[in-house]
UniProtKB/Swiss-Prot annotation:
It catalyses: L-glutamyl-tRNA(Gln) + L-glutamine + ATP + H2O = L-glutaminyl-tRNA(Gln) + L-glutamate + ADP + phosphate + H(+); L-aspartyl-tRNA(Asn) + L-glutamine + ATP + H2O = L-asparaginyl-tRNA(Asn) + L-glutamate + ADP + phosphate + 2 H(+). Gene3D superfamilies: Glu-tRNAGln amidotransferase C subunit, N-terminal domain. One of its GO terms (biological process) is glutaminyl-tRNAGln biosynthesis via transamidation. The keyword Iron-sulfur does not apply. Heterotrimer of A, B and C subunits. This is Aspartyl/glutamyl-tRNA(Asn/Gln) amidotransferase subunit C. Disulfide bonds: none annotated.
């Protein structure tokens, strides 16, 4: 799939972007290079290859990198609220700023 300069200008118009002719030509080259790369990737036969959730698992055991979900800290609400000027029922009281 190759774009034309008209395509780039139309996309810029739809996106409400003002694009100078030199910028449009530069963008055209970049987009066509990108689409060329996508076509190369699509040409590779990947049938029979399982998708990878974590590509690093091909190198090392992913389970070692993921830890168990355990509580490591305790809630110290009272200690945090001790220096506060006003607290009620575990909530910080602040002055009203909007009438």
């Amino acid at each position: 799939m190759a774009l034309t300069l008209t395509d780039v200008k139309r996309i810029a118009h739809l996106a409400r972007l003002e694009l100078a002719d030199a910028d449009a030509e530069h963008t055209l080259v970049q987009l066509n290079d990108f689409f060329g790369l996508v076509e190369q990737m699509q040409a590779v036969d990947t049938s029979g290859i399982a998708p990878l959730a974590h590509p690093i698992e091909q190198i090392e055991d992913v389970a070692l990198r993921l830890r168990n979900d355990v509580v490591t800290e305790t809630v110290e609400r009272e200690a945090f609220q001790r220096p506060a000027p006003a607290v009620q029922d575990g909530l910080y009281l602040v002055p009203k700023v909007i009438e």
